[in-house]
C-alpha cells in the first residue's frame, strides 16, 4: 500500500537508503556480531527484490549521521545553526556535531563506536527489564521515582554505574566507555532487583545522560560559536527531560528538534540530498500521514468530554513521528482524579505513568513554568513544572512536571477550536493527550482501525463530525 502510494508520483530515478549497510557490517564484524554481519537478508538490495515494480532502479547509500543532521537542519528554517546528532549508532558514528551555514552542512566533531550515549541508555533500559530500542521513554518516566545519589558500597549509585561500565570523564573531550554495550548490561549490579532498585537505577541513568548531554552542548557551542540556533536530532533527542535542561545553556536561544528525530525521520535528510530546488524545506506541519477525511469532530468530542468520557479522535492526516498531536489521540478532561488510572488501563500501561497535556498556547504560562527560551512546545519535546498539580492529576508526573503540547490557531486550527470550546464550557484550557493505540500495537491509522479500536477497547472514536 505504501509503495503504491509512492508510485503515484512516478517511477523513482533512484532508491536512496539512510545508511551504508556495508560499512555497518564491517562494524558488526569488529564488534563480534558475526551472525548479524553475515546475514545478507537485511541488505536493502535483498529486501527490495520482493517488489518487482522497483526492478532495475539503482540503490544509493547515504551516511547515517548526515541524514539525521540534514533532516534537522533543512527543516529548521535556520540559515546558521549548530546541529547535534546523538543516537545508538550509525555505521560507526554515535555522536556528531555539524555546522549548518547558508544551506551547507559540515561535520566539526565525531565520536564513534563503542563510545555511545544512546547504547548506554538502551543497555540500561534492558537492565531494568524493559525492551531496548523501544522502552527508553519508560526509563525516563521511572527516573522521577528514584534516587540517583543513593549510596551503594560507599559511593553514589550513579558513580557505581559509571565505575562498572567504565564510563570515563575527560577534561578535553566527551565521555568514553571501556565496556562495549551493544549486547546490553544485564550483568550490572545483580543484587539490585526490587522495584525501588529499578527506579533508582533509572534515576542514575537519566542523571548520567543529562551530564553527558550538557558537555555535548557546551562542545557544540565551542565548535560552532557564531550562532544562537541549535538543532538536535537522533533518537536521543526524544529525551524531553534532558532537552529541558539545556534550553538556555551556553548561549543557544532557539532550539529546533524535528518532530521525528529518529531513524524514520532521517528519510527527509536522504531525500534532501537529491533536492536541487531549495535547501530550506519550509517545514509546515507534522501531519503528513494517512488522511481520514471529514470535518474535525469538534462537536461530538466536546459533548462526550463534557460528559466525562474518555474518547479517541482519528481525523485528518496522521502524525509523522512518535507523538500523537491531536489527529490520532486518546483524550479526556485532565481534572478527574481517576482519569489517569482509567486511561492507563485502556492503554495497558504501567500505572505510574502520567499523560501529556495539550493546552492553548496563550494559556500555557498560567499553568506551567516553561523552560527558559521555550515559548511554545507544539511537538511535546520539553517538560515543564505544573503550577497547579493537584488540579490536574492526569497530566502531572510524580516530580510535578508535564510533557507539554501547546496548540495555536496556525499549527492546528481545529484542535484549537476544540480546546477553546472546552475552555468556554469548563474554564480549563487543556485536555489529556496520548496516542490512540495500545502499548506495543500500531497507532490507529485509518477508519477501519478506528472502528476496531472502539470495538475492542470500548472507547468512542470519532473520525468526523
Question: Can you name each region flagged by the protein language model?
Answer:
Residues 59-62, 191, 195-211, 408, ...:
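Short acidic-aromatic active-site loops that bind/stabilize oxyanions
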Residues 19, 234, 259:
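Residues that line or immediately flank small-molecule/substrate-binding pockets and catalytic motifs
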Residues 229-238:
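Glycine-rich beta-strand-to-loop/alpha-helix junction loops that act as flexible
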Residues 203-228:
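Phosphate/ATP-binding catalytic cores across multiple sugar-kinase/actin-like superfamilies
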Residues 13-14, 16, 82, 229, 231-232, 312:
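Structural motif
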Residues 15-27:
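Short loop/turn segments at strand-loop or loop-helix junctions that form parts
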Residues 1-4, 8-10, 24-40, 45-61, ...:
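Flexible beta->alpha loop and helix N-cap segments adjacent to enzyme active/binding sites
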Amino acid at each position: 500500500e505504501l509503495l503504491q502510494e509512492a508510485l503515484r508520483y512516478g517511477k523513482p530515478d533512484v532508491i536512496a537508503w539512510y545508511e551504508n549497510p556495508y560499512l555497518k557490517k564491517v562494524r558488526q564484524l569488529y564488534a563480534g556480531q558475526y551472525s548479524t554481519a553475515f546475514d545478507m537478508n537485511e541488505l536493502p538490495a535483498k529486501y527490495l527484490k520482493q517488489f518487482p515494480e522497483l526492478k532495475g532502479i539503482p540503490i544509493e547509500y547515504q551516511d547515517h549521521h548526515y541524514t539525521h543532521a540534514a533532516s534537522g537542519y533543512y527543516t529548521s528554517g535556520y540559515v546558521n545553526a549548530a546541529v547535534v546528532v546523538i543516537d545508538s549508532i550509525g555505521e560507526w558514528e554515535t555522536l556528531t556535531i555539524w555546522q549548518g551555514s547558508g544551506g551547507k552542512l559540515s561535520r566539526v566533531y565525531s565520536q564513534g563506536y563503542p563510545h555511545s550515549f544512546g547504547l548506554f541508555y538502551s543497555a540500561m533500559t534492558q537492565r531494568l527489564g524493559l525492551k531496548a530500542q523501544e522502552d527508553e521513554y519508560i526509563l525516563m518516566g521511572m527516573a522521577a521515582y528514584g534516587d540517583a545519589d543513593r549510596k551503594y558500597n560507599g559511593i553514589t549509585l550513579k558513580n557505581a554505574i559509571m565505575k562498572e561500565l567504565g564510563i570515563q570523564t575527560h577534561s578535553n573531550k566527551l565521555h568514553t566507555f571501556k565496556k562495549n554495550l551493544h549486547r546490553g548490561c544485564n550483568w550490572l549490579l545483580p543484587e539490585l532487583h526490587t522495584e525501588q532498585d529499578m527506579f533508582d537505577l533509572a534515576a542514575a541513568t537519566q542523571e548520567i545522560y543529562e551530564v553527558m548531554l550538557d558537555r555535548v552542548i557546551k562542545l557544540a557551542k565551542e565548535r560552532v560559536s557564531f550562532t544562537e540556533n541549535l538543532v538536535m536530532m537522533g533518537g536521543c533527542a526524544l529525551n524531553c527531560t534532558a532537552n529541558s535542561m539545556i534550553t538556555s545553556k551556553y548561549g543557544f536561544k532557539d532550539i529546533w528538534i524535528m518532530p521525528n528525530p529518529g531513524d524514520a525521520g532521517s528519510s527527509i535528510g536522504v531525500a534532501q540530498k537529491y533536492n536541487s530546488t531549495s535547501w530550506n524545506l519550509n517545514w509546515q506541519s507534522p501531519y503528513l500521514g494517512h488522511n481520514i477525511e471529514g470535518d474535525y469532530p469538534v462537536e461530538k468530542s466536546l459533548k462526550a468530554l463534557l460528559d466525562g468520557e474518555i474518547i479517541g479522535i482519528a481525523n485528518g492526516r496522521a502524525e509523522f513521528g512518535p507523538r500523537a498531536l491531536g489527529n490520532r489521540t486518546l483524550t479526556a478532561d485532565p481534572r478527574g482524579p481517576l482519569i489517569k488510572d482509567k486511561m492507563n488501563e485502556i492503554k495497558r500501561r504501567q500505572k505510574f505513568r502520567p499523560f501529556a497535556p495539550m493546552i492553548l498556547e496563550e494559556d500555557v504560562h498560567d499553568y506551567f513554568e516553561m523552560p527558559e527560551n521555550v515559548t511554545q512546545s507544539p511537538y511535546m519535546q520539553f517538560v515543564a513544572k505544573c503550577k497547579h498539580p493537584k488540579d490536574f492529576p492526569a497530566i502531572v508526573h510524580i516530580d510535578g512536571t508535564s510533557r507539554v503540547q501547546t496548540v495555536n490557531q496556525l499549527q492546528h486550527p481545529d484542535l484549537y477550536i476544540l480546546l477553546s470550546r472546552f475552555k468556554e464550557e469548563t474554564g480549563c484550557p487543556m485536555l489529556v493527550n496520548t496516542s490512540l493505540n495500545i502499548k506495543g500495537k500500531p497507532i490507529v491509522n485509518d477508519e477501519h482501525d478506528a472502528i476496531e479500536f472502539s470495538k475492542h477497547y470500548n472507547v468512542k472514536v470519532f473520525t468526523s463530525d
